[in-house]
Amino acid sequence: MTHPPSLLCIGLTTVDVVALPVRLEPFDGVRLIDAVQMAPAGTAAGTALVAAKLRVATQLAGAVGPDAAGRFIRGELIHAGVDVALLEVLPGLPTSATLIPIDAAGNRMIYHSPGAAALMSLSNALKTAAASASAVHYAGVGARNLDGHAAEFLAPAKARGALITCDLIAPGPNSAAELRRLLPYIDVFMPSAVEARFVTGESDLPRAAQALRDWGAGAIVIKNGADGALALDKAGRLGVVPAVKIDRVVDTTSCGDSFCAGFIAATLRGRPWGQALRFAAATASLVARGPATLGVLESYEQADSIAAPASG
């Protein structure tokens, strides 16, 4: 990276193939649809792509295969200005890919092939990058070579004063134990409502947020779709971040990743907690208005113009 502030995103890197609008029912034959779009995606790569669109100097650490999908991801990220020096190519493995048919109402089905993404390595170069970044977004919970070792790069980054955020994707039976290990190094943990309930066993979101904070995270933001987000700050104050109302939802697949990117981008620009969360919600709303990872997001200023005004 050439200039601060810098963000390092670590973890899931995939390509999303979005088809819309479709009828989510079995059929035999050919149907014409409006669009098929491809984009780099995933809790790490999607966040990196959106952050770069918001003019954050961003680097991605992840893994792809030596195939057309991997070359596409790399090329699109480079075109967007993302540093891909830490994007590994793993021989003999396919790139992670996700097929997402979406109907006219925004409902979707998701078909995911894990591929190389979960097998990224814990390298010295990754540790060095984490130690120098202004912010680290960790989206690697469940990665075989990272679970149990995240503290090796998160602890030095936190000691340096970097902003450390974390998100989940499809948590499994070992995710809660991994979170108990790494949340003491996390400033803001940002799971979805489904993920928060799964890992804590709490159906009540405020109780889930408190449980996650008790595991060591500085603050918790639980993303809850059209209901906005539940935020528990580092002082223990609980609040709700309303979702930005939009006329038509097109594709919500990357809304969680874009929320994270928006929060990080605003925080790195010095926005206080409340303003950063509202900017995050505005960013997610722009992504929901169009297909694939970026939706109709064009710039930081565009998102800022629709963020709800308040004192912070």
Region annotations inferred by a language model:
Residues 76-93:
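A glycine-rich helix N-cap at a beta->alpha junction
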Residues 89, 100-144:
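Conserved phosphate-binding/catalytic loop of the ribokinase/pfkB sugar-kinase fold
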Residues 58, 84, 164-165:
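Hydrophobic beta-strand scaffold residues
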Residues 1-11, 32, 156, 173, ...:
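Conserved phosphate-binding/catalytic region of the ribokinase-like
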Residues 49, 97-101, 109, 228-232:
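Short beta-strand scaffold segments in enzyme catalytic cores
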Residues 1-63, 68-75, 79, 249:
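Glycine-rich phosphate/adenosyl-contacting loop at the front of the ribokinase-like
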Residues 125, 196-197, 229, 303:
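A generic structural signal for short hydrophobic patches within well-formed alpha-helices
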Residues 135-210, 227-228:
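Conserved beta-alpha-beta core of the PfkB/ribokinase-like small-molecule kinase fold
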